[in-house]
A protein has these predicted regions:
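Phosphate/pyrophosphate-binding catalytic cores of soluble transferases and nucleic-acid-acting enzymes
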Residues: 1-316
Length: 316
């Protein structure tokens, strides 16, 4: 769906690097940001959380003073919207939209090129199309009634009130199911129909990383094996000890919830890992289903292809 959002040459430019989990976004974005004097805004709904590094495959970095504020650096590249939120807190797509716009303007103010990098499709689309998002406050009473339902029961309910969201949502993520239902019920409109495009703010090039399924699955398996070596089980135990519960948004995502039965003595570690590998591959498939809806994305197999796309984009 072509529209003026990516074609308005008068607007400030930015580049989006998107792709499935374990597709190589980090390496590409660091190389390209260095090449084109850029800074990075993370569009990853899991890497926003502090204390959650291994299960989110967060890019190792450090907080440094940058003028009067601290900024997360990976090497010499500043990163925003990463490692900043307590795991007990909530962060909506609407909040991401607002914060990403703020940091994009900050980066432009330094005469640098903003790179928005991640795999959270809702974050990216809300930003690219300047969505006017539903601002429905969480309803504790409604949420308590939802919590008593299983994921399958919630999904069946969502299919009735919002079949579009039901098709593309992470069906094992109870938090997201609850939020989609909550917004649909309290507003009286399907969650998926409430995201309206606003006026374009930026001239945007979207680059997607194209990865063969077999290669991607090998990357996923390697990453999960590495997570165990790095101490994912110990990371989760530490979070539970700090009273972060399994029903929090931070703990209900891929990379964490799959270890619950193991830590409760109901599964072996090997069973938990097999489940994580299977569900991560399914999650990657869902990501691609989301991205394929946007015909404006330029798919690249190599970082050199992406580099050429950016060079041409900046010349226009």
């Amino acid at each position: 769906m072509k529209n003026q959002h990516t074609e308005n040459k008068q607007l400030p430019k930015l580049v989006v690097i998107l792709g499935q989990t374990a597709s190589g976004k980090t390496d590409w974005s660091l190389y390209l940001a260095k090449k084109f004097n850029g800074e990075i805004i993370s569009a990853d709904s899991r890497q926003i959380f502090k204390k959650m590094d291994i299960g989110t495959a967060k890019t190792p970095g450090e907080w440094r003073w940058d003028g009067f504020k601290k900024t997360y650096y990976v090497g010499d590249i500043p990163h925003y919207l990463i490692d900043f939120l307590d795991p007990g807190k909530y962060f909506t797509s609407a909040e991401f939209h607002d914060q990403a716009i703020k940091y994009t303007k900050l980066i432009h103010g330094k005469n640098k090129l903003p790179f928005v990098v991640g795999g959270t499709g809702m974050y990216i689309q809300s930003f690219v199309d300047n969505y006017k998002m539903p601002r429905i406050a969480p309803n504790k009473k409604l949420r308590r009634s939802f919590e008593e339902k299983s994921e399958m029961e919630l999904l069946e309910w969502l299919k009735q009130v919002d079949p579009i969201s039901a098709e593309i949502i992470d069906q094992k993520n109870k938090r997201r199911l609850i939020r989609a239902l909550e917004v649909s019920i309290l507003s009286g409109e399907p969650f998926s129909s409430q995201q309206k495009m606003g006026e374009p703010l930026f001239n945007i090039l979207q680059i997607g990383i194209k990865k063969e399924k077999e290669d991607l699955h090998q990357n996923i398996e390697r990453r999960i094996d590495e997570m165990v070596k790095l101490g994912i089980v110990e990371e989760i135990k530490s979070l539970l000890k700090q009273k972060y519960s399994w029903d929090l948004p931070s703990m209900s995502g891929v990379g964490y919830r799959q270890f619950r039965e193991h830590l409760e003595g109901k599964e072996t570690l090997e069973q938990a890992l097999e489940k994580l590998k299977k569900e991560t591959k399914h999650f990657a498939k869902k990501q691609m289903t989301w991205f394929k809806r946007d015909q404006r994305i330029c798919w690249s197999e190599t970082v050199e292809d992406a580099e050429k796309l950016i060079e041409d984009f900046l010349k226009k």
